[in-house]
Amino acid sequence: MTNIRKTHPLLKIVNHSFIDLPAPSNISAWWNFGSLLGLCLLIQILTGLFLAMHYTSDTMTAFSSVTHICRDVNYGWLIRYMHANGASLFFICLFLHVGRGLYYGSYTYFETWNIGVILLFAVMATAFMGYVLPWGQMSFWGATVITNHLSAIPYIGTTLVEWIWGGFSVDKATLT
């Protein structure tokens, strides 16, 4: 006698999707982080778009625009906090995803691993730009500290930092 989960039309779908899933036997919860990265990225893009609708580049009104988002925009406080905490969750998932790849030896697949490394650098550069560009003195501090690491490059480091800054120091809003 066959099991009902293998013969009933509706239960057969559930059986093939969850119980008899054609997946490796060593699959674990560590394999969820790639899809969680996609979800975090979608949340970041959507909340970032809504926050960008209220962006102002004037340094005198930048903090007023943040206050406006939190007080006057429907669920603006939620959008702002989802964007801020979503970035942290994104990087936690990213590092766990890389850790899973290291643990399971995915670095032996050179092409796939190298594309992942390139994507990691692209994500870091994008996060840096998102941190430095929009608002206030913390962005100036971030730009100064992070770009000063480039001054460690022999011969061209100092010139490179001044070129990125557009002068001898970061000044005014960086997005106009």
From Swiss-Prot:
One Pfam family of this chain: Cytochrome_B
Family affiliation: Belongs to the cytochrome b family.
Molecular-function GO terms, alphabetical: metal ion binding; ubiquinol-cytochrome-c reductase activity
Binding sites annotated in the UniProt record for heme b b566: 97
Transmembrane segments: 33-53, 77-98, 113-133
A GO cellular-component term linked to this record: mitochondrial inner membrane
Subunit and partners: The cytochrome bc1 complex contains 11 subunits: 3 respiratory subunits (MT-CYB, CYC1 and UQCRFS1), 2 core proteins (UQCRC1 and UQCRC2) and 6 low-molecular weight proteins (UQCRH/QCR6, UQCRB/QCR7, UQCRQ/QCR8, UQCR10/QCR9, UQCR11/QCR10 and a cleavage product of UQCRFS1). This cytochrome bc1 complex then forms a dimer.
Bilayer disposition of the protein: Multi-pass membrane protein
InterPro entries documented for this protein: Cyt_b/b6_N, Cytb/b6-like_sf, Cytochrome_b_N_euk/bac, Di-haem_cyt_TM
Cofactor(s) the record lists: heme b
Disulfide cross-links: none
Organism taxonomic ancestry: Eukaryota, Metazoa, Chordata, Craniata, Vertebrata
Note: Heme 1 (or BL or b562) is low-potential and absorbs at about 562 nm, and heme 2 (or BH or b566) is high-potential and absorbs at about 566 nm.
Keywords: Electron transport, Heme, Iron, Membrane, Metal-binding, Mitochondrion, Mitochondrion inner membrane, Respiratory chain, Transmembrane, Transmembrane helix, Transport, Ubiquinone
Cofactor: how bound: Binds 2 heme b groups non-covalently.
Binding positions for heme b b562 per the UniProt entry: 83
Organism field: Sciurus carolinensis
Role this protein plays: Component of the ubiquinol-cytochrome c reductase complex (complex III or cytochrome b-c1 complex) that is part of the mitochondrial respiratory chain. The b-c1 complex mediates electron transfer from ubiquinol to cytochrome c. Contributes to the generation of a proton gradient across the mitochondrial membrane that is then used for ATP synthesis.
The protein's name: Cytochrome b
Compartment(s) where it occurs, according to its Swiss-Prot or TrEMBL record: Mitochondrion inner membrane
